Amino acid sequence: MRHRGIFYLVNALLALGVVLLFLQIKDIEPLPPQEREKPEEIFSVSDKKQRFLAALAPVVGRVHDDLMQRYLQVQRWLEQGRKQEAIAKLKLEYKVDTDPELLQALKPHPPSVALAQAAMESAWGTSRFFVEANNVFGVWSFNSHEARIAAGEKRGEKTIWVRKYDSLEASVRDYYRLLGRSAAFKEFRQLRMRSDDPHELVKKLHRYSEKSHAYGEELSAVIKYNEFTRFDGEGY
């Protein structure tokens, strides 16, 4: 009987301990669930290129077509001696004096050239400039009053800035405008009046990059390997 009493006492104490432990656990606030970190999306080279072209090829094509229509319109105005005031404004904008120089400035080059430059300058749409600033072509900014972001490098003690655009289309239009009015690309403009061959045109873009003439060779290789001339349409 004595042993049986001790047995019941031990069981009662154990039961009481379990109850007390349960009550303590209820009073403890549960820890917030840990959010699982999502792994960064990893794309193959092929996927990256497809995403780049899906985003940019339609934009480049649309801008090119718009600029070509403007070029043909201005060409008709000059032939007919019309719209002198509008022509004067365009000459001022593009920093030219003569009618032939204006046509050189306005004629757009093939989309294949623009896409090759975009691919190289933005690392197929993965550069910080492309993602954060819609800056497709790595265009620098020298105006502190315009929208821009700091680059990750400097020239001596000076910070390099690149332009920030509201859209990819705004970036593409500014790029065509840059090549149409900068003195650095005068030979390029002269050549595109005589030829629409992208592999010839890129040879005159050596001043766009510190790579100099090797830059044109790389652009030509990008155009050929990725068959970018398929975006040039029947006119090319």
What kind of feature is each model-predicted range?
Residues 2-116, 120-236:
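Catalytic cores of secreted/periplasmic lytic hydrolases that degrade extracellular macromolecules
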